[in-house]
């Protein structure tokens, strides 16, 4: 659990502390299968999505300190482990998590003229439309995960436990990435 204590969840936002505590509490239970077995099961679900040439384009789009591909994969992996532990729909969780940020632009510099609201409000719908265009029909749970992962910005809360799980994991992973993205800048200023 010491590795999880190093994750920078020192946020005043209560749900991040709760997620950290929950993950730290459940981590030993998540290791009931070997890492190799879990990875094999995860990639059996994930490969049809991540091997798609359109999906591979996400590797070139920056997201905090990484790229969208790596961010989505991190969210999907952690969500997969927690979904297994809580008996949730693993396939829906993995696919929904992989597709939750399925847009092809750098949100810091690009503004879509079709959307009035800022990226945080509009990209769930953009991601859903892209997912349907590339992968076809999605399950109701997958759709809910994608469209509502920015809750409470999306106003309507997630309908399924799977959606809420991915929403919370996404916030934790994105917070960690954002924190890591600014840390090198802080180190540079301290050294001067």
Where are the predicted features?
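Metal-dependent phosphohydrolase cores
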Residues: 1-192
């Amino acid at each position: 659990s010491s590795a999880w204590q190093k994750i920078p969840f020192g946020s005043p936002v209560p749900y991040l502390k709760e997620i950290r505590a929950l993950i730290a509490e459940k981590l030993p239970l998540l290791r009931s299968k070997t890492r190799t077995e879990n990875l094999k099961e995860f990639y059996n679900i994930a490969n049809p999505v991540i091997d798609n040439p359109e999906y591979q384009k996400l590797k070139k789009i920056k997201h905090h300190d990484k790229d969208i591909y790596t961010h989505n994969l991190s969210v999907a992996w952690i969500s997969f482990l927690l979904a297994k532990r809580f008996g949730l729909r693993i396939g829906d969780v993995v696919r929904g998590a992989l597709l939750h940020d399925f847009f092809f632009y750098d949100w810091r510099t690009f503004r879509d003229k079709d959307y009035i609201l800022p990226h945080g409000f509009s990209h769930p719908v953009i991601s859903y439309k892209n997912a349907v265009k590339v992968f076809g029909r999605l399950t109701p749970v997958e759709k809910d995960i994608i469209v509502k992962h920015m809750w409470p910005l999306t106003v309507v809360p997630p309908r399924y436990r799977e959606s809420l799980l991915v929403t919370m994991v996404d916030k934790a992973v994105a917070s960690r990435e954002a924190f890591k993205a600014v840390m090198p800048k802080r180190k540079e200023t301290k050294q001067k």
